[in-house]
């Protein structure tokens, strides 16, 4: 850091570099090793922010030698977006609120402090306990007042989804009796009691019946596209079973079952063939298909001020592989089926909590509510947050309710580490990178927002 200050001083010595070098050189005596390290990181960030704000960026964005992003040294060089007032305020607040006692920092992150007298150590432990309990109380209050959905609201939303599912099932059996489908079923966070803030979304899984000898699935990593977590569904044995042998041959594009064509087939049924106003009047709901591009979505008003979105999700099962017609973010991969991991992730999370009466699901709900209420964190999905909790469960055994605050902070730090690397491996299938569909700009924004909240995590609960 001193070297960085010297190089900058040669270019534009305005006195700030000298002051910062003096502060850093004496910080260790006042704050200890841990405090000096954190103060150094934050001070360097402010100094570089100031330097870059007064000189237009000219060089391309740089990564660290390890190839990882770092929000201790923000990745703004070459960005077309100039530093705004919110960024400066965020970094200034982080610097001002840093603890002045090195014992407040994680001793696993920095060099261990010198041994302290027992009385002093007891006071520090008591202080840390009070701080932890304060955050614990705020997390529980946030969950009760902001994240938790009243049981009555959940029940009414589920009942509306069940009623509509029954009507759609009856219609398909009557109008399209030759369409090979298994029974439709409801899925999603509302069904699994993991939805937060409002009961406003649920999925209706529509399983297709495929002949096992006519279809096979090819992992995305084995194709020229090299995309783990996605599959091609290939039509097999056309020489023995010509086109038309399977009902779903009509949805084959280039020798592969196209999820987009399957979705278009259901769109004609959902949006074009069913008289939803009449069904809505019968059920005392207001039902209408969502406008494009959300073609396979129904918008339901089941009470005066309560709305529910129902997504129709075609699904195929080949052997042990379950795929859903949820498209890749990039249109060029619209012929790929997505591997369905959410049911297994949810089942593992629930099993872990049931085994030790843990707080994993509670921690997940709080994180989901924060992301849902914070626009800057809107790109984080429930699956990504679930996998952060599952990875943390492999590292930490104690998930008792009184450890909620500690585990919450660890989850934030872990999430920042995954964003720095640009990789979040699936806990169930490590080949799958759950950040693969995020752009570098989105990853930087998420990492910056979370990093600025580390020194004052309560800010996340005020959104």
UniProtKB/Swiss-Prot annotation:
Membrane topology category: Single-pass membrane protein
Sequence ranges on the Cytoplasmic membrane side: 47-463
SMART domains noted in UniProt: Mab-21
Keywords for the protein's UniProt record, in alphabetical order: Membrane, Mitochondrion, Mitochondrion outer membrane, Nucleotide-binding, Phosphoprotein, Transmembrane, Transmembrane helix
Region of interest (Disordered), ranges: 57-77
A Pfam family: MID51-like_C
Renumbered residue ranges of the record's region Dimerization: 49-195
Function: Mitochondrial outer membrane protein which regulates mitochondrial fission/fusion dynamics. Promotes the recruitment and association of the fission mediator dynamin-related protein 1 (DNM1L) to the mitochondrial surface independently of the mitochondrial fission FIS1 and MFF proteins. Regulates DNM1L GTPase activity and DNM1L oligomerization. Binds ADP and can also bind GDP, although with lower affinity. Does not bind CDP, UDP, ATP, AMP or GTP. Inhibits DNM1L GTPase activity in the absence of bound ADP.
Subunit-structure text: Homodimer. Interacts with DNM1L.
Protein name, as recorded: Mitochondrial dynamics protein MID51
Biological source species: Rattus norvegicus
